């Protein structure tokens, strides 16, 4: 990471400009992101400004505005050419040093310690862990929430493999939260724990930096009781899944959740989804299958998976697992989310789609598309924990919901290109967008209708 003092000196020496604290924060942020994205020094970032005729004669105020506006054009070249940039929508936070003591995730998963609530001390889930890891330390606690409040954790401990086996007391079932003014697909979430043994640079769970490890409920039978009551009021089938705050299958060889979930949902008028980045399907292949049980995989180019999705299965491993599950009689689905606007994104995502349709039989239950998006806290956490990652140095701006998103012209190009590529192979699989507004949805040809999303996916 280049030194702030050095940049300040270079600006003063080369450009004859002394910045106040707030001005320097903005300039440093822009210069830092350009240097990271393009892998160049601060000298190279400032070089074009030194050559600007008459710059040295500008007043200090004009120099600052010219410097900032020029760096904005370098930082957001495509958007600068397509539209006027509202500077209020540029997130210019203070540049921070990355963590030196960040916990590194290394497969295979091995828990560091298990905390178990008293009410579930005799649970099968704890027995499963102890059988797999006979020397693991186990500590009995009353409530995990109370433990976390009295034992403070830092972001550097975020991915420590601490396991909390708990009795879930909240709502097992809830609607998938959808951003205001964005279209919902009618999805329901089955709350099957919190946290993930994988470590993706873009994962929004990083915002919950005060809680390390994984929370796993031991009382899944209470969910079945709850869902039996809930389902009596359903007027039509729903889609429900477990992959919102955890990976559905990453630890299935230990938790064995699938062994009870799949038989339970086979007889229900729902589409039940298990969402994963793993190839942990051994338990599934021993179970009776049904098309209403959908196993879905998140897909990104192989190079992106290697760089940004630590400890996950490779792209090839995911597709091989999907083919086995499909051949066993389960439904399969795929999520291109987040799609990252890389330099050669058309080629990279096109290759993923080519490989997908060469290995599996169409049609699929569904395919969703969603471009990279995050709140400001997530970008900061990613910079601290993944200093080698450049994904947030693409052309991302704060939207109405205060999330960082690509501008409409980039999103629309991505969605249309990928939809067209899928349609070359497959006219039947329903394609939908995740967390997008109606205006964007209606501009893309080939998606399920924006006014009938839920019914189109059931």
Walk through the language-model features, giving the residues of each.
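C-terminal accessory regions of radical SAM enzymes
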Residues: 390-458
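Flexible glycine/acidic-rich beta-alpha junction loops that bind and position SAM and/or redox cofactors
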Residues: 308-309, 340-345, 365-402, 438-446
